[in-house]
Regions:
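Glycine-rich segments within core transmembrane alpha-helices of 12-TM secondary carriers
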Residues: 140-164
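Juxtamembrane intracellular "pre-TM" segments in multi-pass secondary transporters
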Residues: 1-10, 200-238
């Protein structure tokens, strides 16, 4: 029997289609452009590869620290839509500015900001799944999100790749082609997010509302909020996990 998505599930999946374009950009075109900027600044290959690794690690640490806190806050304090929207806009605007900066240092800084915001938006996005679908459909909907995300992200990627490869034949410079490519991905990301933003499920009840209901225990997300300090401390200071930063 064919699995049929309902309207809200489709809108949830569309965000995966949008943000996956940014993921593909990070894995393909973005390192090439950073290589170009670093080479223009006279930085050796060894150094610019190291700097790229440091920037990626910095974004990972930021998400590891802020992810649990923002995730709990979005679930228990009625801020889900606000946190999701802010993360989305910071990530998309960072993507736009990445394409037009001519400084490798600013490029790395913007990369850390954009990638962190992108990852934090996913924390809130994933938490929406139980509100978008039922438990027995969650696995299928999540799988559809991954599948359509990869397929849909190919559209802006192919257009961006054509611009980067054949920029000289259409009268553009390398920097202009990159700027248009990054702008294209950011616009795609935002446009694919609009249906979900417009129909975002109702916010979770604030913490005080749970406490005011007789006999109502605090939800798991609130309990996790008060447990984020020690787990985060253990992750950051557990030596065996440091290899993940390389």
């Amino acid at each position: 029997m064919r699995f049929k998505l309902n309207d809200m599930e489709k809108k949830w999946i569309l965000y995966d289609v949008g943000n996956s374009a940014f993921t593909l950009l990070i894995a393909t075109i973005m390192p090439i452009y950073f290589n170009y900027l670093a080479d223009q600044a006279g930085i050796s290959e060894v150094n610019y590869l190291a700097y790229w690794g440091y920037a990626t690690s910095a974004a990972t640490i930021i998400v590891a620290v802020l992810g649990p806190v923002l995730g709990a806050a979005s679930d228990t304090k009625g801020r889900r839509k606000k946190i999701f929207l802010v993360s989305l806009l910071i990530g998309a605007l960072g993507c736009v500015f990445l394409g037009f900066t001519q400084s490798w240092i600013w490029f790395l800084l913007l990369f850390v900001i954009a990638k962190s915001a992108y990852s934090l938006s996913l924390v809130v996005y994933d938490s929406m799944l139980p509100d978008v679908t039922t438990d027995d459909r969650a696995d299928q909907v999540s799988a559809q999100g991954y599948a359509w995300g990869y397929i849909g992200s190919c559209i802006p990627f192919i257009l961006s790749l054509m611009l980067v490869l054949f920029y000289d034949k259409i009268g553009l410079t390398m920097k202009t082609a990159m700027g248009i490519s990054f702008l294209l991905v950011a616009v795609w990301w935002i446009v694919m997010s609009l249906p979900l933003l417009k129909n975002l499920p109702a916010e979770a009840l604030p913490v005080s509302s749970f406490r005011q209901q007789p006999g109502c225990q605090l939800p798991p997300s609130e309990r996790s909020f008060f447990r984020t300090e020690k787990p985060t401390e253990k992750v950051l200071f557990f030596p065996d996990c440091l290899f993940l930063l390389y």
